A protein has these predicted regions:
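Short cysteine/histidine-rich metal-coordination sites, predominantly Zn2+-binding motifs
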Residues: 109-117, 127-136
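Flexible, glycine-rich terminal cap/loop adjacent to redox cofactors
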Residues: 100, 117-120
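Twin-arginine (Tat) signal peptide motif
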Residues: 1-7
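Beta-strand-rich cores of mature extracytoplasmic or soluble domains
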Residues: 106-110, 122-125, 129, 143, ...
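Short Pro/Gly-enriched beta-strand edge/turn motifs at strand-loop
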Residues: 59-64, 119-125
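N-terminal pre-ligand scaffold of iron-sulfur
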Residues: 8, 12, 18, 25-96, ...
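Short alpha-helical basic/polar micro-motif
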Residues: 4, 93, 122
Length: 164
């Protein structure tokens, strides 16, 4: 092999090695990001024995997940109704009309949104107002007395529940 040919071969080999060193982690990140996109992680909300039965309570908790290349940690809240120590309904705190946070009115036994006066029953159905669909439930599970939630965000202002 001529000296010039050897140098070309050597430079090509170094370029391939350099490409692998830089490219493999990048491709791995893209693949893992694509695999987890749109899938929320389970977040620990708290012990169920501290929650009252049959009465909605708003609970704040820290949720975490990966979006694109970034690990994020957010402070979120959910509305929880414990039907028993092993069964709960968890609502997103976001009104399905335009995204305000609603509250529970204990006196009237209903959820009320302060922005445009949508009113929801204890089971989340719309009683009055412009909300186009019932309150959004979140996936929840109870393991060893601890409630976990998959915190997701949904499109507002539409009759269909769509994760965003
Ligand atoms: S945002 Fe709740 S009623 Fe409009």
């Amino acid at each position: 092999m001529q000296r010039r040919g050897f140098l070309k071969w050597l430079v090509s080999c170094l370029a391939v090695i350099n490409g692998l060193i830089l490219g493999i982690p990048f491709i791995g990140t893209l693949l893992s990001s694509a695999a987890t996109r749109g899938k929320a992680a389970w977040s620990r909300v708290g012990a169920v024995d501290r929650l009252p039965l049959g009465v909605p309570v708003e609970v704040r908790f820290q949720s975490s997940g990966t979006e694109a290349y970034f690990h994020r940690s957010d402070l979120n809240s959910v509305w929880i109704i414990m039907h028993s120590r092993g069964d709960a309904t968890v609502f997103s705190p976001v009104c399905t009309h335009l995204g305000c946070h609603f509250t529970w009115n204990q006196q009237h036994g209903r959820f009320e949104c302060p922005c445009h006066a949508s009113v929801f029953a204890l089971d989340g159905t719309v009683l009055y107002g412009p909300a186009p669909r019932r309150l959004d439930t979140l996936p929840a599970k109870i393991e060893k007395g601890v409630l976990y939630v998959e915190y997701e965000r949904f499109q507002v202002g539409t009759p269909e529940k769509k994760v965003i």
